[in-house]
Amino acid sequence: MKQAKFIAIVLLSFIILILFFSCKDEQPEIPDFHADALQIQEEYRPGFAVRKLKHLLIYTYGLCGEYDVDYEIVKAVVGVESHWNTRSLSSANCKGLMQISKDAASDLQSSQADLYNPYVNLTLGVMYLSWLQEKYNGNQKKVLKAYHDGPGRVDRAGILNYRKDTYVNKVLQLAARN
């Protein structure tokens, strides 16, 4: 009986050791926020403080982790939508970094006045992308098409030709570049 317990303890200890050493403690690679901020400044916002861009990027990275949205995709959406201009206003009356419409803001229970606040805008945009990811089962092209054209249009269109969709392709190319 004692020998059986001893063997069981040794085997259990051995299994635990194998599991311990076989599991790699993989940490996600954290982006170089300073390099990203410099790149954004050079491409889109000359004269905009790198420190502020860096802070926005760190905030964005945290949001992406919280809502399980790809950080590079969000950076690309912001680049395509507003060129990182916090005061951007489209002809369709979409506002801020992620070009949030008043309808999307009200759907996400935020006032339209907040849309020029970059932190509110990023939060709403990432939340919206997260919701679209869930709605379209992670189909990134459909998610981006719906972000740009609205989910109603995507749902009515059925099969979409993404090869000809310049918005979707721009965002994906920009995200892949980083």
Range-by-range predicted roles:
Residues 72-76, 88, 137-146:
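Surface-exposed patches in mature extracellular/periplasmic domains of secreted proteins
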Residues 62, 79, 102, 106, ...:
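Short glycine/serine- and small hydrophobic-enriched flexible loop segments
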Residues 1-12:
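N-terminal Sec-pathway targeting helices
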Residues 113-121:
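A short, structured beta-strand-centered segment in the mid-to-C-terminal lobe
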Residues 29-36, 104-107, 138-178:
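Catalytic and substrate-binding regions of cell-wall glycan-acting enzymes that process beta-1,4-linked
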Residues 24-84:
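Export/targeting segments at the very N-terminus of extracytoplasmic proteins
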Residues 91-110, 125, 171:
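Substrate-binding/active-site groove segments that recognize
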